[in-house]
């Protein structure tokens, strides 16, 4: 992450607010990341809509090191196409992208890529990939994009493989982005993972649920809090409060998914861990 200084952050925030106000309405309705009044849950619900309409072959697109490979000249060109022509603004955006990284006490300027961690990064990522969104729209494809996570939905495996090959070529030729040959794949919904969710069919209808990796992360976070309490002799009340925050946050994020059975199993595990802690105090 490229964490900007206070002054840089203020300038970036000012530019980001102006760009968002000017450009957000021009972005694709199928782009959900880093945009006002949009969320990951809305993106996942849109994927469910496609799948239940019969577009149940998924192209799970993986752009290699997206933020590290954004082409500066191409980005400035796209901004000009969107009537962002103020020379001072464009100069500041380019300076931000070229801020570089510190290695062995020396600053190495960046020739490509966008530093992550600043207020400008999200809007710039959407500006750059909006070209891709419009290309998919022009082709009449069903897709959902959240930042650099993009899934495309079609009705047959043959179409999916053809589209995957075509959009991979387009991204490399037009936006100079490399698509991972090993991570990009054509799958059925049950094998697809998007924003921490996967899919299952219940009574003839597709539903979403937390992926196994997402479930394991919840276990790991709670387990670490319980172990950490022992290591630093933290009060049991503080530990329970922190675990409650983790669990409530997790459930809130995955609230649109099927998870009753998992929550029951997880609850039993957590109650057992808590009982052990309480017994050890006596």
Task: Please report, for each region that a protein language model flagged, where it lies by residue.
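Short acidic (Asp/Glu) and glycine-rich catalytic loops that position anionic groups and cofactors
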Residues: 23-27, 55-57, 71-74, 105-108, ...
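Right-hand nucleic-acid polymerase module
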Residues: 206, 225-282
């Amino acid at each position: 992450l490229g964490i900007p200084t206070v002054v840089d952050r203020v300038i970036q925030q000012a530019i980001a607010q102006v760009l968002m106000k000017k450009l957000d309405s021009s972005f694709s309705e199928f782009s959900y990341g880093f945009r006002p009044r949009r969320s990951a849950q809305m993106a996942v619900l849109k994927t469910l809509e496609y799948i239940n309409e019969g577009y149940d072959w998924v192209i799970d697109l993986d752009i290699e090191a997206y933020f590290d490979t954004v082409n500066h000249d191409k980005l400035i060109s796209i901004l000009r196409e969107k009537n962002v022509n103020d020379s001072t603004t464009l100069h500041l955006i380019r300076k931000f992208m070229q801020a570089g990284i510190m290695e062995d006490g020396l600053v190495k300027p960046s020739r490509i890529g966008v530093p992550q961690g600043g207020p400008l990064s999200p809007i710039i990522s959407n500006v750059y990939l909006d070209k891709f969104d419009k290309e998919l729209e022009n082709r009449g494809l069903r897709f959902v994009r959240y930042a650099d996570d993009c899934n495309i939905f079609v009705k047959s495996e043959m179409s999916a493989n053809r589209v995957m090959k075509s959009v991979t070529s387009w991204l490399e030729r037009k936006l100079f982005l490399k698509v991972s040959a090993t991570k990009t794949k054509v799958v059925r919904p049950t094998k697809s993972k998007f924003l921490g969710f996967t899919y299952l069919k219940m009574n003839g209808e597709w539903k979403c649920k937390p992926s196994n990796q997402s479930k394991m992360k919840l276990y790991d976070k709670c387990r670490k809090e319980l172990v950490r309490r022992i290591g630093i002799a933290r009060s049991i009340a503080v530990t329970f409060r922190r675990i409650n925050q983790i669990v409530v946050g997790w459930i809130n994020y995955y609230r649109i998914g099927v998870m009753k059975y998992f929550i029951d199993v997880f609850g039993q595990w957590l109650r057992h861990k808590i009982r052990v802690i309480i017994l050890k105090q006596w």
